[in-house]
């Protein structure tokens, strides 16, 4: 008998190991298969646990890691970086150099430059020879397929060596890049030159300088300055002077920045060299372009003091700069100064001043200059009139604008369609649609044909005012004039009709515009998408989104933001990121809302690093975060418990001049409460009052919860009373929190009294007394349990909400654990009478109760009733009932349920067994002498990956054999 048992044990071990090998092993010779398997695991959220528990028969060696990185099977480089870090942290063997290169390239391709730099720095720290590192990056770059600029990683490598202080290696990278025809940035070259000067490596300095010249790198003042220092340090003073004069030549071609040019100009004056007029003109022009107008004006004074001639050109440069800087008064002063100097003033200077003044809205000054121009004998031309008319119309003074239009006619000045259009637009904006229409008829009568812009303005305004018939009449007249509607006209029609929900008419114009050879754009499709969304016809909206893409139309940022938001709402952050990257690749610049929506989606799906990277990218693109953007970050880090980070972002937000609102404070306050930093939460509450912000119900709910969990019920109830005094109605969460807090301190009686503190009650919810019941049945005395149960059943708590399935499940479970099955069964029937459906938890509690009391015969009808009621058993329920069948010797029925359980797992993985459950099942079959059945069950457990490794298999087999031996010994007893 014992020999047979030993043989069976060995057979089981052999078969189990074979099954494990077939399920988890990877052929070492097939590297790509291993790479594919690992890549598949990496696509899972819990890839680390899966990878560790997979027990791959091959070791994850450097060759496999390299294969995974170069295979491009994993789209998320951040996940590849996490995998690489995890493998590298094992410190078993050194990773291959090419692995670093491929990973850095992938990160660069995804725009994660900071992460790429960290990988490069780790590569440098391995102390590989720079030639090998360079060769690896070149080789991998040639093999890599991506959209990143080839020069990005080489620049990062250069930065890495500089940051580590490896100057010679940085020079090697600089020199080697010449072979790839890469032009280094001037900023990088200057950093390298500066380092070489500090280390007095003039030999390498001149090599780098020569390379810069050969690659036509444009020098700035600082570069020339370092060159002069190098010459002087080498004793070549004359060469240093030559560089200075060469810099003057560069200055004349305006290749230096303005500050550098100013410094050079000062050095020239100090050396007794008076800059040429051309030099001053370039400087004034440069200063005006960067809006340093006071500096530009001071140069005008300096020119005069040095005897440099001032002419019309110099003044015009400064006047133009002042006008572009919206400083029309100063420009007007220069005009008078020119008159005093006897410099001829050209009419266009007046026109420019009048134009800017009109745009600034200083119409009195503009009109005064206009009248002064006439007084000086100059006749204003069409531009001056057009500027004034536009200014008056912009200020809604359409009548004054129209009078100037009449004056133009009297002076026989040709009126352009643009000027007519300005008056038409002004009248439309002021609501005088009939007057605008009369101007159009007046145009036609005078022989000036209205253009499509003017007609579109009229049509658009008629549609906005729901005068659809007039809009169609104007459209018809436009066509009769031989003017074909353009894309803007059709878009105005489609947008106006879509907003009025006249979608069929809008669609007819879409068909017409396509027939006329016009291609719909994002505004066209956007009108349909917005119209259908507003009408809650989402399927139709999706149809137009798809049609837009199929037609190759780029969406605008509003549509892109909407798509990103929808993806994030559905938890599809990969698709959301893809939509964002597609938007960026297509040159569409998002706004703060775009980035906020994406960051919020990433945080909600635990992509914290990616959310931070998007925030940095947002700042890098010059898009200023708003309160909502900062709120997403503060809320995300607060929920993660990283209050140091959340507080830092809060401080940054304040430093940026943004004022936090109550919602922002609630986010921080909640984070501090969850982290147990209740005093900091109280400080925030006080700070809100100091800043004039009124805490709302959420504020009080949050901090009351914090004090309850910290055990300070006195402060919690004080805030509870304060909340009600301020007219804020506590919701069910507040009551639940207070109940839970009282019960934690074993003050159940006080918890019961809470329900009588608010005569108006709170939002209908069973949560407060579910919390109470849980504590009462867990720790309360029998009398208290009976009292609460009676009050619950007689409706005393009904104003707070009727008992739900959770209420009954709590009570039934505790009664079953106490062995009070009759009371539990009575509650079960009351639950059904209250039209509440028992759940799998309800039935499992009853089954456990009967099993504990040894009343297994009563378990089986309960289980049958659960199945008949449509309950889907979980692994706990299956385990309980199967063990009951085994204990009663009903092996066949137990095996039927085991097969059902295995089949269910194969379909939806919804019933995966734990090791303890596996142990109980195998032991149960072994104890009743069903070793063949136990063997079959074990094979299924291995196949479905319930058992993680061979060691566990052997352990379970040993236990089963022991149980079987005990059965044999029991049978042998006479």
Curated annotation (Swiss-Prot):
Presence of the UniProt keyword DNA repair in the record: no
Ranges occupied by PPR repeats: 96-130, 150-184, 185-219, 220-250, 257-275, 276-310, 311-345, 346-380, 381-415, 416-450, 451-485, 486-520, 521-555, 556-590, 591-625, 626-660, 661-695, 696-730, 731-761, 765-799, 804-838, 839-873, 874-908, 914-948
Keywords, ordered alphabetically: Mitochondrion, Repeat, Transit peptide
Subcellular localization(s) per the UniProt record: Mitochondrion
SUPFAM superfamilies recorded: TPR-like (SSF48452)
Pfam families xref list: PPR (PF01535), PPR_1 (PF12854), PPR_2 (PF13041), PPR_3 (PF13812)
GO terms under cellular component: mitochondrion
Family matches, as NCBIfam families: PPR
Family (UniProt): Belongs to the PPR family. P subfamily.
UniProt-recorded name of the protein: Pentatricopeptide repeat-containing protein At5g61990, mitochondrial
